Amino acid sequence: MAVISRDEIASYCRLDEDALIDEAFLLAETMESRLRQKGAVDTAVTHATFCLAVKAMTLHELDHPGEKYPQGIQDMINELKFAKN
C-alpha cells in the first residue's frame, strides 16, 4: 500500500523526531485504508489528490484527534469517491 513515503509525511507534517515520524507514517497508512474503504478512487488521474488527502487527513488527525474533517478535506474525499476510473 503506502502511496506516500515516510519522508513525505515527515516533511508535510513538519516532524523531525523519529518516534513522531513513525507514528505519523503508521497513521498515514490507516488514513489511506480509510479512504479506500470509503470508496475513494486512486488512478493516474486522481493520484495526486489521493496522496494529498492522505497527508491532510494524517496531519488533521495528529493535530485534532477524533475531530471531524474540515470542509476542504471532506471535499477531497468526496471528489475521490465520485471520480471516474
Question: Which residues does each PLM region occupy?
Answer:
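Divalent metal-cofactor coordination and adjacent catalytic microenvironments
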Residues: 1-85
